[in-house]
């Protein structure tokens, strides 16, 4: 499930995944093409354990002192991997910076090597990032070794499930040591995803929408709207398209949902909010 040196499973010596090792980090999506991956020192240690995280977890990472490893869930982390939508690219003389957001937050990613493979990256597409957490002038950013475009949207969903599983592993272990009750699925605050965390949030939305008898496609769009960060402007149709993936006629679905009075436009015809978010 986790990877040592971008390939070997294992978040740590005591992590026994409920998933098969071959599923680690979306390995089912053939992401580990060794010919295109950066070389990594294979020594064991926190700095060489690749951990799946959300951007919120990165931004909330802590250090004991300036030279210490960053910690997430009280555990030292070195290399991290996350997925998100590439919002901005800024090429400079010595490096290229990318602004990436995943619904839990936004972070700057810096890449110092000019690799031809990165030229295929485009804004408003999902990417996977590998790198290390750094801080400069009080601002956390990611020093990236590798960034690639995500071609199978299932990888996005799998990543968040994996991040939840690892988060629960470490937090449940800590609670057990401290004699506290092990948490169920209350992971939304730590991970930043209010609607990915539990049966509760998802089921609550489904219960509220039950009276509308929505199709699976319409329900998928509603879930995407509620999963996006809640703002006064709502969610842009472009972000919705990225979230729901291909195969859904987004125009037809949003038109229907507007006619039913379930969603409405805000600052322009491309931004939508759910009426349930106002309740």
Swiss-Prot record:
Keywords: DNA replication, DNA-binding, Nucleus, Phosphoprotein. GO terms for cellular component: chromosome, telomeric region; cytosol; DNA replication factor A complex; nucleus; RNA polymerase I complex; site of double-strand break. InterPro entries: NA-bd_OB-fold, NA-bd_OB_tRNA, RFA2-like, Rfa2/RPA32, RPA_C, WH-like_DNA-bd_sf, WH_DNA-bd_sf. It is found in: Nucleus. Binds to single-stranded sequences. Heterotrimer of 68, 30, and 12 kDa chains. This is Replication factor A protein 2. It comes from Schizosaccharomyces pombe (strain 972 / ATCC 24843) (Fission yeast). The gene is ssb2.
